[in-house]
């Protein structure tokens, strides 16, 4: 892969390359388009760790995305300066690397359904149960299409939002640059790849998938524009864009550190334990500082992230030749010398925060909410003779999700998952309560 091509300013859905503006580059415009999108605004009421939390100090998906974007920008500028010198790149600034990463990081969770990963699991499980029950008489959709829903993936939904749903009547949706879209694609493959094929190619980028069958052609255009290395001539499957490794690292180090801080703010983790874990990375002289426990944790969090950013940037530069050749497919954070400390943090956070009864209880409720909503709407739009409730449910779909008489089954299911996954935690909860007569 070549950096000059990897940083393509071409916009998906546009034939002409837009004129370069130094004061507001194409990649800065990408960032702005994401910020002003409806899907991004909805992240303010989507779960990061604590569903439906009333504590203003803990993070929602929106705040998490903004923080990851800041870290991504720093990583991009740090490595960009060195890469430009190393490859003698022309007409490219270090800020371009930072701006691409900032935009991609900002959008990295934009496709997540309500209730976080529990929401993804709920959609997968509900679809599989519904399909097994309703499909005894024959195939509703083909195996490639079915895999999109069997393994419903927020990353693929995110690519669909950016390239189609964000502005559905315009080719390319938000019409972001191919560089930003390729960087966004953490898992640059389709959902249906034989397990025996995947088993021969272990790596981080293969653990999930990054686009639905509906957007396969769009992703192919992005991949070919920026020059991603194809992994197989038989399936839609590429090596990652190099900057994707930095986007992943920005996300990994942010949630590792800030989930710890949020656990402290919620009262699930004691001050001494959180201070000890953060200090193992930050390594500062705490005797030089005064302040409350909350201020101490805030200072340690900032110092820890700063050290991790510098470490990850250097690791990327060390592995850059293999990354460009498509020979590297590991987590930069896991290669860090701080990996043991981060694993200890993950274990403590998982046990004390993610498994806390208050968190688990709401996640279970969210699982039921999304699963039942998906089942209700799928039955409504796909049954030939739905029951009276099913007939009425069709009118609950917003205009952009209304089903046309001539649409195929795959498109109908996509419109339902678009609607359900696009809700906020509160929207899904209220709709569930209303449809069951719990509240009106």
From Swiss-Prot:
Residues 61-256 form the HD domain. It comes from the Bacteria. Coiled coil: none annotated. InterPro entries: dGTP_triP_hydro_central_sf, dGTP_triphosphohydrolase_C, dGTPase, dGTPase-like, dNTPase_3, HD/PDEase_dom, HD_domain, PHydrolase_assoc_dom. GO terms for molecular function: dGTPase activity. Keywords: Hydrolase. GO terms for biological process: dGTP catabolic process. Belongs to the dGTPase family. Type 3 subfamily. NCBIfam families: dGTP_triPase, PRK01096.1. This is Deoxyguanosinetriphosphate triphosphohydrolase-like protein. It comes from Synechocystis sp. (strain ATCC 27184 / PCC 6803 / Kazusa).
């Amino acid at each position: 892969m070549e950096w000059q091509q990897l940083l393509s300013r071409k916009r998906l859905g546009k034939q002409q390359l837009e004129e370069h503006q130094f004061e507001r580059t194409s990649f800065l415009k990408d960032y702005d388009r994401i910020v002003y999108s409806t899907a991004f605004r909805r992240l303010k009421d989507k779960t990061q760790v604590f569903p439906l939390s009333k504590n203003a100090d803990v993070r929602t998906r929106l705040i998490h995305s903004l923080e990851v974007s800041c870290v991504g920008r720093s990583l991009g500028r740090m490595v960009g300066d060195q890469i430009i010198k190393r490859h003698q790149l022309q007409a490219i600034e270090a800020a371009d690397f930072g701006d691409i990463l900032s935009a991609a990081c900002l959008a990295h969770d934009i496709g997540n359904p309500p209730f976080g990963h529990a929401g993804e699991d709920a959609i997968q499980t509900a679809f599989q149960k519904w399909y097994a029950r309703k499909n005894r008489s024959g195939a509703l959709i083909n195996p490639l299409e079915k895999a999109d829903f069997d393994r419903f993936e927020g990353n693929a939904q995110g690519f669909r939002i950016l390239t189609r749903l964000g502005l559905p009547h315009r080719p390319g949706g938000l019409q972001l640059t191919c560089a930003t879209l390729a960087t966004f694609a953490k898992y640059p493959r389709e959902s249906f790849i034989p397990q025996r094929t995947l088993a021969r190619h272990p790596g981080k980028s293969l653990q999930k998938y990054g686009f639905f069958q509906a957007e396969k052609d769009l992703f192919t255009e992005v991949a070919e524009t920026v020059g991603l290395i194809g992994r197989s001539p038989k399936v839609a499957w590429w090596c990652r864009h190099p900057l994707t490794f930095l986007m992943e690292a920005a996300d990994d180090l942010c949630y590792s550190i800030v989930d710890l801080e949020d656990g402290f703010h919620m009262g699930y983790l004691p001050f001494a334990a959180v201070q000890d874990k953060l200090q193992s990375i930050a390594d500062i002289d705490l005797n030089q500082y005064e302040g409350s426990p909350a201020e101490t944790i805030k200072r340690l969090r900032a110092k820890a992230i700063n050290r991790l950013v510098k470490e990850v940037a250097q690791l990327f530069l060390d592995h850059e030749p293999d990354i460009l050749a498509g020979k590297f497919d590991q987590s930069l954070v896991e290669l860090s010398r701080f990996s043991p400390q981060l694993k200890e943090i993950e274990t403590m956070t998982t046990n004390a925060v993610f498994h806390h009864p208050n968190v688990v209880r709401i996640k279970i409720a969210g699982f039921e909410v999304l699963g039942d909503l998906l089942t209700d709407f799928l039955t409504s739009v796909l049954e030939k003779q739905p029951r009276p409730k099913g007939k009425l449910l069709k009118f609950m779909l917003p205009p952009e999700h209304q089903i046309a008489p001539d649409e195929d089954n795959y498109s109908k299911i996509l419109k339902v998952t678009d609607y359900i996954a696009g809700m906020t935690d509160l929207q899904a909860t209220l709709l569930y309560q209303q449809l069951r007569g719990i509240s009106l």
